[in-house]
């Protein structure tokens, strides 16, 4: 399970009866809580399958698991539309992660991308499926930051041959968005892999 906004000290590990949580944040002294933070929660029965854990920052974390092939899971947490200028660096890091791990097996990226992908984005590319969550009211106008986040997500997926998986499967409206603060635009969480989904 990939978690965002964990607000936990850097590189902490929390072990429970049935699962272990590995945290990553930007706090280097281990005493302060961060504004972001990502974590990956794993069943204890899978701990012996862990090949590597990379706590990169409070916005990125990677874990590789051994199976019949190596599965690499990346947890990404993009900045909101208030700070979209910080996202290109995260996307550069994501491209590097995909490049390093792609030959070993599936690379699955999930998290909170703070992006609003629309059905019109599906035209002309294979990254977006037919099951997007489109605006329902004119009052839900996208701001420039949200548009920038969307474009960066689409550019990344297209350039890397990834899909935005939750746009490829029919589901009710609620699972298409994960959170909507009153008066704001719905934000989507995406998972995508470099292999074709049939």
Please report, for each region that a protein language model flagged, where it lies by residue.
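A shared catalytic/ligand-binding motif for oxyanion handling
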Residues: 1-198
């Amino acid at each position: 399970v990939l978690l965002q906004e964990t607000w936990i000290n850097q590189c902490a590990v929390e072990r429970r009866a049935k699962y272990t949580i590995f945290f990553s944040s930007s706090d280097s002294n281990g005493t302060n809580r961060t504004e972001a933070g990502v974590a990956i929660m794993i069943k204890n029965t899978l701990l012996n399958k862990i090949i590597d854990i990379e706590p990169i920052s409070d916005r990125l974390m990677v874990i590789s698991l051994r199976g019949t092939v190596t599965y690499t899971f990346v947890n990404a947490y993009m900045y909101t539309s208030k700070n979209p200028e910080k996202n290109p660096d995260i996307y550069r890091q994501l491209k590097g992660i995909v490049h390093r791990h792609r030959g070993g097996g599936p690379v699955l990226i999930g998290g909170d991308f703070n992006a609003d992908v629309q059905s019109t984005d599906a035209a002309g590319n294979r990254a977006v499926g037919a099951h997007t969550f489109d605006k329902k009211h004119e009052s839900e106008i996208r701001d420039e930051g949200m548009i920038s986040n969307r474009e960066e997500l689409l550019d990344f997926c297209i350039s890397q041959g990834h899909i935005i998986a939750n746009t490829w499967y029919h589901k009710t409206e609620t699972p298409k968005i994960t959170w909507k603060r009153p008066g704001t635009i719905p934000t989507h969480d995406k998972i995508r892999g470099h292999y074709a989904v049939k």
